[in-house]
Every structure is written in structure tokens, then in C-alpha cells.
């Protein structure tokens, strides 16, 4: 078992490397840990636009949410998306639950993607 001192030191090194204070890093760990407890199929990952929620072993939550939106109105968009085979029905259900809990976060990610895509297409 690793000592608390070594773990705290490693967290401090990681925080400094990421440009975070130790207290910011610990606050983020607590927030993400609480969200993982609430949504066990969800993890968090770094990327060029910051940290975001993603399916464990799968795409980002916002991507799956956007795919569902892009299917338009329908009786069972989740079943339709699952039939494509990219994500399973349990993964889609996990995305829907996370989106219901944190709608502003997911909508902001979708909006950012759509704005970036529109800007790239305009070039």
C-alpha cells in the first residue's frame, strides 16, 4: 500500500505539471469522484478543450448526446443508435442519465463542437 505522503507528493507534482494548485486538483478529484459514484459508467479525461466526461472504454458523453440529437425526433432514438453498434444500449442509458444530471455541461460541449465545426467549414 502506498503511503499517503507519497500519494500527496505525486498529486502535487501532477497538479503543478497541469498548472493547477494542489487545492484545485483535490477539489477536482472530489467532484469527479462524486460524479463517478453517481454515474459508474462515466470517467473523466483531458483534451484540448479541457476535461470532459466520457464513457469508460467509449466516446465522450457529449458526442453520444449529440448523435442522439442528430437522429431527430423518433420513438426510440437510443435503440436506433445502439443498432449502429458504436455504443451499446447500457452506454446510451448512462449518457442519458449523466446528461439529465448535468445538462448545461453537455450542451456547452455540443455547442463548442458545432461552433468549431462551423468555423472550420467557413475557412
List where the protein language model places each region.
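Short amphipathic alpha-helical segments
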Residues: 1, 11, 18-31
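Short, basic interhelical loop/turn and adjoining N-cap
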Residues: 20-21, 82-94
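Short, charged amphipathic recognition helices of the HTH superfamily
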Residues: 21-23, 71-83
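Short, solvent-exposed alpha-helical "recognition" segments
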Residues: 34-38, 74, 95-108
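Short, positively charged interaction helices/loops
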Residues: 35-61
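Short Lys/Arg-enriched helix C-cap and helix-to-coil transition segments
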Residues: 39-45, 105-115
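Intrinsically disordered, low-complexity basic tails/linkers immediately adjacent to helix-turn-helix/homeobox/MYB/SANT
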Residues: 48-58, 111-123
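Short, amphipathic alpha-helical "recognition" segments used to contact nucleic acids or chromatin
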Residues: 58-75
